[in-house]
């Protein structure tokens, strides 16, 4: 079933659990407040990202972890995910098109020699999006494509002279 788990330790928990040095870039998330959207800081101490080909394996491992941490940790949030059609998000667009793959993906997320005590580790930020699906579904496909900056069916990115400067693609290109 391809069972895998990634464990993460939050900034405050790190200091309580470990006496030695901390990863150089480990810090609490700073809340972001924009004109229309906010990203609040909701720190946690432990994160377990569990994945498998079937949900029962995820459930079993999650239950075992929670059981082992009983009395020491309390579950404050739990999210189940699933593969949606051909790698699309719930808005109907292909997700992760620009994400690196293969060794480039590993290089993009792995701590290297710059913080040698933690080389091979990584950092994680979790974002939870709440979409107004009724409003989204009320938009025409053309309007949705302008919001995202890609063609919905073909996943082709709009040309720069057509793509709105405030589209998802324009604002989230690193």
What are these regions (language model features)?
Residues 1-174:
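Long, histidine/aromatic-enriched segments associated with O2/redox biology
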């Amino acid at each position: 079933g391809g069972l895998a788990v990634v464990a993460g330790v939050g900034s405050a928990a790190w200091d309580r659990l470990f006496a030695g040095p901390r990863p150089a870039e480990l810090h609490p998330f700073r809340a972001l407040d924009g004109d229309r959207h906010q990203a609040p800081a909701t720190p946690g101490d432990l994160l377990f990202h569990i994945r498998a080909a079937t949900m029962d394996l995820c459930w079993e491992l999650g239950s075992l972890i929670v059981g082992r941490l009983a009395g020491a940790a309390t579950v404050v949030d739990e999210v189940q995910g699933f593969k949606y059609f051909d790698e699309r998000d719930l808005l109907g667009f292909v997700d992760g098109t620009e994400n690196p793959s293969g060794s480039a993906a590993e290089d993009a997320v792995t701590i290297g020699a710059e913080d040698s005590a933690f080389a091979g580790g990584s950092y994680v930020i979790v974002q939870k999006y709440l979409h107004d699906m009724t409003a989204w579904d009320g938009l025409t496909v053309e309007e949705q494509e302008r919001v995202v900056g890609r063609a919905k069916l073909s996943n082709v990115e709009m040309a720069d002279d057509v793509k709105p400067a405030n589209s998802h693609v324009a604002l989230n290109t690193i």
